[in-house]
C-alpha cells in the first residue's frame, strides 16, 4: 500500500489534530518548507531531531555517456541536496517493514 502524503494533506492533518483553521494550517506547512528551502539556499544544513538531516553536497564534474549513441559527454559539476534519515526514523520504518512481512 503506497500512498503519498502531500502538503495539502499535512495541512488537513494540522486542521484536524491541532485545531488550526484551514488557512493557518496551510500557512504553517508552507512556512515550514519555505524555512527549509531558505536555509539550504544559504548553504546551511537543516537538522530535524528524530527525523533526519538535509545537507548540500558538491558533486564534481564526471564523464558520462549518451545511452543512445554511446558518445562520451561531460556531466557538469553541481550542488545537490541530500537527506539522511535519523536512527530513530530508520528504526521506525524498519519496524513497520518487519511487521508487514509477518503472516
Swiss-Prot record:
GO terms for biological process: DNA recombination; positive regulation of metabolic process; regulation of DNA-templated transcription; regulation of translation. One of its GO terms (cellular component) is cytosol. This protein is one of the two subunits of integration host factor, a specific DNA-binding protein that functions in genetic recombination as well as in transcriptional and translational control. Keywords: DNA recombination, DNA-binding, Transcription, Transcription regulation, Translation regulation. The keyword Ion transport does not apply. This is Integration host factor subunit alpha. It comes from Azoarcus sp. (strain BH72). Belongs to the bacterial histone-like protein family. Residues 51-73 are annotated as: Disordered. Disulfide bonds: none annotated. InterPro entries: Hist_DNA-bd (IPR000119), Histone-like_DNA-bd_CS (IPR020816), IHF-like_DNA-bd_dom_sf (IPR010992), IHF_alpha (IPR005684). Heterodimer of an alpha and a beta chain. Pfam families: Bac_DNA_binding. PROSITE patterns: HISTONE_LIKE (PS00045). GO terms for molecular function: DNA binding; structural constituent of chromatin. CDD domains: IHF_A.
